[in-house]
């Protein structure tokens, strides 16, 4: 528990202190956000708001994770794990793709950065490397950071993917989650606040896996997760980093996370879901992100097949704005829905454990 508190605190402090420094730096160099011309009229006054604040989020997560391990050395704590480094490596790689995208937008003074092909190639490259490496690094108990079995709350032994299919599966998961968080990041604080809740749920889930790991507590309901405590630290650090950033990103936002932050945070969800064996459960926890990307897909499909739109504008948080909802109303209501989804996900997780032990 002490390690979790250290991870949250260090990440929060780094994020909340680094963000205003970045705001001053980006403002001085004119690194401001460009706004879609076809977006809601109320968003036009946001043009020029400093972007790429996701740098503070990524830095906060790394600081929280590494700082906890450095502090742990004084108490005979374990070093970093393969699972932890791979999840953060994935998030950082995706954040790098987002950083290039943000930088190009700023340099060209338009809301279009990397072209779709270049952005997709970057995401797929990160996903392939993650998918290949996450099945390596077998520990003394014979566990790798991920399992080739499809998983809900734990592995579904009847659905085992061949290595090539598993890598393809990782490509889908990583691309889907990174784009989903990216689409959600359209209102002040929406993505950061929602992400804090999802990763808070993962703190509970992975810590429970740690307390009931088959390596240390074999028996009914135990979990074959390689490094559950390290995943808890990553989730906790993400909570702290998002809250620290939210202090400056809440409406009216003084800074945006940009693709730097949204793609990296999507990588955190993807990485945690794969390494904690909860790929399907993650869909429940992050159902807001799922709904946002689904609204974009539906909008595109409907327009291409019928010439009509399902929503006034996609992602669908803009639909409610154009319907007359105030931006803060949309944000708070979506946060409430995220909290409900996370609560439901934790209940499903715990309920599965109770059913497994026959309680």
Swiss-Prot record:
Chain segments annotated as transmembrane: 3-23, 55-75, 80-100, 117-137, 156-176, 187-207, 231-251, 255-275, 280-300, 334-354
Location(s), subcellular: Cell membrane
Known catalytic reactions: UDP-N-acetyl-alpha-D-muramoyl-L-alanyl-gamma-D-glutamyl-meso-2,6-diaminopimeloyl-D-alanyl-D-alanine + di-trans,octa-cis-undecaprenyl phosphate = di-trans,octa-cis-undecaprenyl diphospho-N-acetyl-alpha-D-muramoyl-L-alanyl-D-glutamyl-meso-2,6-diaminopimeloyl-D-alanyl-D-alanine + UMP
Membrane-related topology note: Multi-pass membrane protein
Keywords, in A-Z order: Cell cycle, Cell division, Cell membrane, Cell shape, Cell wall biogenesis/degradation, Magnesium, Membrane, Metal-binding, Peptidoglycan synthesis, Transferase, Transmembrane, Transmembrane helix
Signal peptide: none
Cofactor(s) named in the record: Mg(2+)
Matching InterPro entries: Glycosyl_transferase_4, PNAcMuramoyl-5peptid_Trfase, PNAcMuramoyl-5peptid_Trfase_CS
Enzyme class: transferase
E.C. number: 2.7.8.13
Superkingdom per UniProt: Bacteria
Functional pathway: Cell wall biogenesis; peptidoglycan biosynthesis
Biological-process GO terms, alphabetical: cell division; cell wall organization; peptidoglycan biosynthetic process; regulation of cell shape
Cellular component, GO annotation: plasma membrane
GO MF: metal ion binding; phospho-N-acetylmuramoyl-pentapeptide-transferase activity; UDP-N-acetylmuramoyl-L-alanyl-D-glutamyl-meso-2,6-diaminopimelyl-D-alanyl-D-alanine:undecaprenyl-phosphate transferase activity
PROSITE patterns: MRAY_1, MRAY_2
The UniProt record lists the keyword Amino-acid biosynthesis: no
Job of this protein: Catalyzes the initial step of the lipid cycle reactions in the biosynthesis of the cell wall peptidoglycan: transfers peptidoglycan precursor phospho-MurNAc-pentapeptide from UDP-MurNAc-pentapeptide onto the lipid carrier undecaprenyl phosphate, yielding undecaprenyl-pyrophosphoryl-MurNAc-pentapeptide, known as lipid I.
PANTHER family the UniProt entry points to: PHOSPHO-N-ACETYLMURAMOYL-PENTAPEPTIDE-TRANSFERASE, PHOSPHO-N-ACETYLMURAMOYL-PENTAPEPTIDE-TRANSFERASE HOMOLOG
Entry similarity comment: Belongs to the glycosyltransferase 4 family. MraY subfamily.
HAMAP family tied to this protein: MraY
Name of the molecule in the record: Phospho-N-acetylmuramoyl-pentapeptide-transferase
């Amino acid at each position: 528990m002490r390690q979790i508190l250290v991870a949250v605190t260090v990440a929060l402090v780094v994020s909340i202190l680094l963000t205003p420094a970045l705001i001053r730096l980006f403002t001085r160099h004119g690194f401001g956000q460009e706004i879609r011309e076809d977006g809601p009229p109320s968003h036009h006054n946001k043009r020029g708001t400093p972007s790429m604040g996701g740098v503070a989020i990524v830095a906060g997560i790394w600081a929280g994770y590494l700082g906890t391990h450095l502090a742990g050395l004084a108490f005979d704590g374990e070093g970093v794990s393969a699972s932890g480094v791979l999840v953060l490596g994935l998030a950082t790689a995706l954040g790098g793709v987002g950083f290039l995208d943000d930088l190009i937008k700023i340099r060209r003074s338009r809301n279009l950065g990397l072209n779709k092909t270049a952005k997709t190639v970057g995401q797929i490259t990160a996903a392939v490397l993650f998918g290949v490496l996450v099945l390596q690094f077998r520990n003394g108990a014979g566990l790798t950071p991920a399992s080739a079995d499809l998983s809900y709350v734990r592995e579904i032994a009847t659905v085992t993917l061949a290595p090539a299919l598993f890598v393809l599966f990782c490509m889908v998961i990583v691309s889907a989650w990174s784009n989903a968080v990216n689409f959600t990041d359209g209102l002040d604080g929406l993505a950061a606040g929602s992400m804090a809740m999802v990763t808070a749920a993962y703190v509970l889930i992975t810590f429970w896996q740690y307390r009931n790991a088959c390596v240390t507590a074999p028996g009914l309901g135990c979990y074959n997760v390689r490094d559950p405590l390290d995943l808890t630290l990553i989730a906790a650090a993400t909570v702290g980093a998002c809250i620290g950033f939210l202090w400056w990103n809440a409406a009216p936002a003084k800074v945006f996370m940009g693709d730097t932050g949204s793609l990296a945070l999507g990588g955190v969800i993807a990485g945690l879901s794969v390494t904690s064996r909860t790929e399907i459960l993650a869909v429940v926890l992050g159902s807001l992100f799922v709904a946002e990307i689904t609204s974009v897909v539906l909008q595109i499909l409907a327009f291409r097949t019928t010439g009509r739109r399902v929503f006034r504008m996609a992602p669908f948080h803009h639909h409610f704005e154009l319907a007359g909802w105030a931006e803060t109303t949309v944000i708070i209501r979506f946060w409430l829905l995220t909290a409900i989804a996370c609560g439901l996900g934790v209940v499903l997780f715990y309920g599965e454990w109770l059913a497994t032990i026959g309680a």
